[in-house]
């Protein structure tokens, strides 16, 4: 339902901006829906949110690009990740209209990163076992050092 997806998208958009982050998948906030919001605009004060409902990647480039990625689900941890430099994604937009977007650069990376969440994959899953275990240890240590009052 477009109205429900739009309302949920607006909530996720606020959560993404509050975090702050450039993308958020519904599943990251415990909602098992295939909805993604993102905003990679760099201009201060100019927001350009994008909504992707039921996104499907139709094509990925064989050429890779590397970006340092972080994630609201893996706080304060960052790593360089190789992903296809371009992708085509089909989705329903904010108004429920079917769209096909050819993305490259940071937008392509962000789409793939957020779509990974829909499949239960985190950016740290692309790392070597050693790097991934180091990040998990850091997160566990942070969690155990955080007192709940």
Feature locations, PLM:
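Active-site rim/adjacent substrate-binding subdomains
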Residues: 6-112, 117-149
């Amino acid at each position: 339902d477009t109205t429900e997806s739009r309302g949920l998208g607006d909530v996720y958009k606020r959560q993404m901006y509050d975090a702050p982050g450039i993308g958020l998948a519904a599943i990251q906030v415990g909602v098992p829906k295939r909805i993604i919001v993102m905003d990679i605009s760099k201009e201060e004060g100019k927001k350009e949110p994008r909504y992707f409902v039921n996104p499907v990647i139709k094509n990925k480039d064989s050429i890779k690009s590397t970006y340092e990625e972080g994630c609201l689900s893996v706080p304060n941890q960052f790593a360089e990740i190789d992903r296809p430099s371009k992708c085509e994604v089909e989705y329903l937009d904010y108004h429920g209209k079917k769209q096909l977007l050819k993305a490259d650069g940071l937008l392509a990376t962000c789409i793939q990163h957020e779509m990974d969440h829909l499949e239960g994959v985190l950016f740290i899953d692309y790392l070597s076992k050693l790097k991934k275990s180091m990040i998990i240890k850091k997160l566990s240590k942070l969690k155990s050092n955080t007192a709940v009052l």
